[in-house]
Amino acid sequence: MPVRVHALDHLVINVADVAVTTEWYRKILGMEVKVFDPGGGKAPRTSLQFGQQKINVRPRDADKVEWFTADHQTAGSEDLCFLTASTPDEVVAHLKAHGVAIEEGPAAKQGARGTLRSVYCRDPDGSLIEISSYED
């Protein structure tokens, strides 16, 4: 029987400055910043939690033995889409109120479950952040 995944539990982003990045995601996207013990005598790690998901925030220069990770750790290389219950106009107003430049949108895009209305911006490392809501 083939293995089939059914959900994404967490992902890891590599960043230049954990404190700057986590504060941006907390302030702009309302994520909760948590510090956790990875076990094995390793240093504590920081994550961003929202809904039933989390993003582990890895310093791009962390030792690969200390933090087992992908072969290439480049800050600013992510392209992430987050879902919100807010309208695109509310997202635009929120981003503008916090001085975040809008790269594109609102625009219709194709999501995993249908048509999205998306607004794009960039996080402190330059990763592309898409904030979206599904059309009714």
Model-derived segments and spans:
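N-terminal beta-strand motif that seeds the catalytic metal site of vicinal oxygen chelate
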Residues: 1-20, 78-80, 132-136
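Vicinal oxygen chelate
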Residues: 2-4, 83, 92-136
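Conserved catalytic-core motifs of GNAT/GCN5-like acyltransferases
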Residues: 12, 32-39, 104-110, 136
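Core segments of cupin and vicinal oxygen chelate
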Residues: 13-62
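Short, conserved charged micro-motifs
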Residues: 20-21, 87-92
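Exposed loop/turn and edge beta-strand positions of beta-sandwich/beta-sheet ligand-binding modules
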Residues: 42-44, 76, 115
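Residue-level detector of beta-strand structural context in well-folded domains
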Residues: 45-46, 80, 119
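Helix-adjacent hinge/juxtasegments
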Residues: 70-83
